[in-house]
Amino acid sequence: MSKVLMVVAQKNFRDEELFIPKEMLQTEGHDVKIASLARAKATGMLGASVMPDMAVHEANPDFFDAIIIVGGSGSPVLAESEDVLGLVQNANARNKIVAAICLGPMALARAGVLAGKKATIFKTEESLKVLKQGGAKYTGEDVTVDGRFVTACGPHAANDFGRKLIEMLKEQH
């Protein structure tokens, strides 16, 4: 089955946006790894914690079929990380599935991979500005797919986001 990398902020990732798609992907037999900016415990907004399998700078996109940026109030930090932006750009250059949920699409926009693409995001003044600066066309949908890119607007869309990722991984193989 496919290998998937989920990237979370060290602090204040959105719990459901990690655990719901992760569980769905694993149930389908996909190998899911977690990365964060450091190999140290990451904590969610609702109190869950996870020990990342690797730091983002250790992640090689060649080993993964999909890269997912998890949202939450801490996720804008990921959009400021050269390691995260480089990972997204490298995954895109290798024609991988690139996905993000909630505020996670800010990292995709800052990496320059959403130019000319339709996308959705957790709507704030700042997030819409970053999407626009990245050349994305905001849809306002719960989940938006444009080619290999999947974006979702927040925790209530985590199930649909997971289902869409599973569909796309099946099509890839």
Summary of predicted features, one role per range:
Residues 102:
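Catalytic nucleophile serine of serine hydrolases
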Residues 1-94, 98, 107-113, 128-173:
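Extended, subdomain-level signal for the structured scaffold at the beginning of enzyme domains
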Residues 122-124:
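Glycine/proline-rich loop-helix segments at beta-alpha junctions forming the active-site rim
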Residues 119:
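Acidic, metal/cofactor-coordinating or nucleic-acid-engaging core segments within structured domains
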